[in-house]
Swiss-Prot record:
Protein name: Large ribosomal subunit protein uL5
NCBIfam families, per the entry: PRK00010.1
Taxonomy, superkingdom: Bacteria
An example Gene Ontology CC term for this record: ribonucleoprotein complex
Amino acid sequence: MAEAKALPRFKKLYQDNIRKALLEEFKYDNEMQIPRITKVVLNMGVGEATGDSKKPAVAAEDLAMIAGQKAVVTRARNSIATFKLREGMPIGAKVTLRQDRMYEFLDRLITIALPRVRDFRGLNPKSFDGRGNYAMGIKEHIVFPEINYDKVDQIWGMDIIVCTTAKTDDEARSFLRAFNFPFRQ
């Protein structure tokens, strides 16, 4: 008989507590109006890729270890002569997380990775895009426990975008605050 797969901690938190709290706070007419996280996108741009084409592949490996899912190498859409960049050159890596992997990543990000960031004073509460999505940047990818610090030859930054179905920034802010996102006061 197949074992029942354990529900990720953040998904259980969302289903049991956050949905009810948001329904009371914003007084939605329909349960489908309650915001939910649709996806989390991790992006790592590698600026030195123009000089060494192997760097985006290494960044993709690191990103795959962080996300638990294979990363896609991104390529330049058009040529820029001042950056010595040609169309089609590999310049970074990205991963889109959905469903359980997304909740597991957010759990690791908030409970383990963000507290390990040097001089961390909280996330910027103004980094919403006006449509309920939140974007943040991390300067060092070594804050994640999956990355072995001794084997890293170069430290890269990364962008993390949390896409939600919230209609406004205020809805999204209180929604993410319920997940214990450490926003600055």
